[in-house]
Amino acid sequence: IESANEFYPFTAKQLPTTENCHVLDLGCGTGLELQEYYLLNPSAMVTGIDLSQGMLAELKRKFANKDITLMLGSYFDVPFGEEVFDAAVSVESLHHFTKGEKIKLYSKLHKALKDKGYFILTDYFSLSDDEEQVHRRNLLALKAEQGITDDEFYHYDIPLTVKHESEALVEAGFSSVVVLNNWGATYTIKAVK
């Protein structure tokens, strides 16, 4: 991914460095952002959620000596709890979902964060409303062509614009949403509870 060598370290630097803080990683994969983060905060307690057993196994192998809890499943389905996490992070994972789906997820995430907790989102976004609509139309056409129902998850990119992503976060209850940086179409957004 273009600029990954820049945005993974940048994202990690946005996470809390307080001792024994608890961080939720949505779509953690093999933990690319955690490589950088554990250098900054070796005592962090991380809960990672991912759909891939193989990626979780690799992450566990890489960080066998860290305080990490891994959950196999969809972050839409796995319970997060309430006021559990100091921060949450997601890198290049949430561009597969509609604004409505994200509002539901972000509402659940908002409840899971402690007071003054925050969410760091690094992902790629559509650069215009037209581009966002093209992605959405292409997905709908593909689903119709292949008989995929709305109940089924289909791994297809439908990135929102930064404006629409920010609106989803605000609608979910976040009080402050700011863009921290960008690399072309990839942005880092911070949303504070």
Task: Briefly describe each language-model feature range.
Residues 172-193:
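Core SAM-dependent methyltransferase catalytic element
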Residues 122-172, 178:
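C-terminal alpha-helical "lid/dimerization" subdomain adjacent to the S-adenosyl-L-methionine
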Residues 103-115:
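A short glycine-rich, Lys/Arg-flanked "PGG" loop and its adjoining helix->strand segment in the class I
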Residues 92-93:
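Short catalytic micro-motifs in class I SAM-dependent methyltransferases
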Residues 24, 30-77:
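Class I SAM-dependent methyltransferase SAM/SAH-binding core
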Residues 88-89:
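Hydrophobic beta-strand segment of the Class I
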